[in-house]
Amino acid sequence: MVLAMLAWAGSFVSAKYLAMYINEHELVTYRYLITTSTTLPVLMYLNISYKIDLRNLAIAAITAILLVAYTKLFFLGTKIGTASFGGALITTLMPIIAFVIVLIFSKKKPIAKDWLALFIGAIGVSTMLEVWQFDLDEIFSTATVFFLWAATSWALMSVATAQSKSVSPILLSFYIYLIATLFNTVFFYENVSGSVFNMDAIFWVNILLMSIASTTFAATVYVAGMQRWGSKCTVFTFLVPFFVIILGAVFLGEAIQLSTIFGAMLTVSALMLINNISLKSLRS
């Protein structure tokens, strides 16, 4: 599980390298084509049928479109911003946004704990943005806007996939990747960067890491973890923002900002409140 979270964090660093080679439309097609191809052996190994009903297929289609949007937004944000900040902001903000969406559309009224969690989360995000230093134009720079919309897209994906019933999560993921590949290739893809087979080793290492390690591997391990440990598995996702910060410093030379670390800690605390996770349960 730790390796899976490390691989997911690595996707933000890989995006920074890939931005030097291809655009966002090419990235989506190449990434999810490889991911779709490498998910097939997983389905075969686990003996999972390819059959899916229309309801779950429709959910997969909606999620695929949101996935295309998320991937392009976080890629564009990382291209002009920093991978460490973007990764920390997105991975801590998206579950909070998902929680707010569920609160809005459900009949359940938020309790005091929920309001406290949202308040702590807001303080954490504000700390990462360093709102005390800039005016509004600087706070909501182009990169930050991309990251915020990316987090929102992923949150909507989480809400959509939660509606799926009686389907293997890995099978649902396979159709999401397949539809995302087809949708992007038909409507957006245009080869403007030349043949990928002429790209150097740096490109191939990063596209394979992003496609296989951070998507096929990480998603499969996470699903297996959820089946074995249930909701306790979510605690591992709290490692992602800190892994992103470390990887950004090691591979990209990005400065480690105390505001980013402290803000991530606050938002992780908010997520622990939302998920009813205590320090005692983490130790166990």
Please describe what each predicted stretch is.
Residues A7, S11-F12, L40-I90, T127, ...:
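Specific transmembrane alpha-helical segments of multi-pass solute transporters/efflux pumps
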Residues L18, L27, R31, G77, ...:
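Hydrophobic/aromatic residues within transmembrane alpha-helices
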Residues D53-L57, A88-T91, K107-T127, D137-A143, ...:
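Loop-to-transmembrane alpha-helix entry segments
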